[in-house]
Amino acid sequence: MKIKIILLSIILVLLPTSIFAQKQDASAVVQSFYKFHLSRSGIFNASEVNARKKWFTDDLNKLFQTELQREKEYLKANPTDKPHFGDGFPFQPFDECESAGKLIKNTYQVGAATVKGEKATVEVKFYQPKECGGDLIDTYKVELVKSNGKWLINDWLYSDAKTLTEDLKRTNY
């Protein structure tokens, strides 16, 4: 009987810790992704998609590969037009402000994860730099799924209730 009580006590102590670790891990993945993403070119091309693929689910990676092919075909037929992701990856609002003739990037804040089983949602808030007012620009939600014990990004939910995967699956280029 004492052993059962001790084991139950250990389980009750460790359970909240493991739940916290899951939340922390999902947020840490998003934080790591944005740190990497913002350290590189935001240009949407095969090299940059491949550089980010370790953070994405297989499904999201496939959608990006399909988009690259669609873009290639579109540009072949319309060489002077801007492609759909011609302004770069849609992982953040258009950023930068100008202060004293210098272009200054926006800042971001990664929130805590909301975990439900094998899915997590992490809120990311984007702010103007302090030099440009520091106001909140937009909030995105990053959806993650657990695959082989690892959190992977599966989608972005934008403030207008549209998602990245919906955009990538659009019928018309």
Q: What name fits each language-model region?
A:
Residues R40-R52:
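Surface-exposed patches in mature extracellular/periplasmic domains of secreted proteins
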Residues V49-L63:
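Amphipathic alpha-helical surface "interface" segments used
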Residues M1-Q24:
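Bacterial Sec-dependent N-terminal signal peptides
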Residues V115-K141, S147-N148, L152-Y173:
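Low-complexity, intrinsically disordered terminal/linker segments enriched in charged
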Residues F20-A28, K141-S147:
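N-terminal helix-cap/turn-to-beta initiation motif at the start of protein domains
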Residues F20, S41-G42, R70-N78, L136-Y140:
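Short, charged low-complexity linear motifs
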Residues T57, F64-C132:
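Surface-exposed, charged secondary-structure patches
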Residues D25-S41:
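Short, aromatic-enriched amphipathic alpha-helices that serve as compact interaction elements
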